[in-house]
Amino acid sequence: MRILFLGDVIGISGCSKLMNNLMDEIKSKKIDFVIVNGENAASQGVGLTKEICLDFFNCGVDVITTGNHVWDQKEIMEYIDKENRSLRPKNLFEPAPGKGFNIYN
């Protein structure tokens, strides 16, 4: 299995680069599973939004990891609580929205 794990995608330019190039990379490198850290993907480089998550999933991302900056965009709290493909840090305060880990097939 080939796994691609990309570090911090930051702001609009990082999102654009990812969305414009990921599918080609997946095909050319025969990638089976893609993990991206998206905690700084929002337009100002802080936080994450539902819209960005959906864009990432649509361009080939399988799982989005986050960090403490994920909460900088408050709208993500309800979404991350329902979306199994978006993960918050496991060692975050309890009870925090979302999941700290998951198993994917």
For the regions a language model picked out, list residue spans one by one.
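Acidic, metal/ion-coordinating pockets
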Residues: M1-N105
